[in-house]
Amino acid sequence: MVSNASALGRNGVHDFILVRATAIVLTLYIIYMVGFFATSGELTYEVWIGFFASAFTKVFTLLALFSILIHAWIGMWQVLTDYVKPLALRLMLQLVIVVALVVYVIYGFVVVWGV
């Protein structure tokens, strides 16, 4: 078995399970947000702040952000591995994507817990 240091999971089955699990988390988060928008009536700044003042909403939002990170990394790794053959270019693109995803999650963490 070939081990790849840039893959997130231990093997293809592990990646498959991670992608499915993160998809479920993201689907539940979308349902949660749609439910909020459908039941909140008029959406004002105070309502929005009140919604994100809840610890459950903050934790669920961060879980969704981490799920996006994992889901996107596995998907982009698979696409780059399949279609970008020059090693240097593939590693550079992987680095750029990882940095962008990590910055995205850190920024999301700051925004969510800054409310």
Curated annotation (Swiss-Prot):
The record's subcellular locations are: Cell inner membrane
Which residues are exposed on the Periplasmic face of the membrane? 37-58
Q: Gene encoding it?
A: sdhD
Entry protein name: Succinate dehydrogenase hydrophobic membrane anchor subunit
Topological domains annotated Cytoplasmic: 1-15, 81-90
Against CDD domains, the record matches this protein to: SQR_TypeC_SdhD
**How does this chain assemble?**
Part of an enzyme complex containing four subunits: a flavoprotein, an iron-sulfur protein, plus two membrane-anchoring proteins, SdhC and SdhD. The complex can form homotrimers.
Q: Which positions does UniProt annotate for a ubiquinone binding? A: 83
Q: Which organism is it from?
A: Escherichia coli (strain K12)
- Give the GO biological process terms: aerobic electron transport chain; aerobic respiration; cytochrome complex assembly; tricarboxylic acid cycle
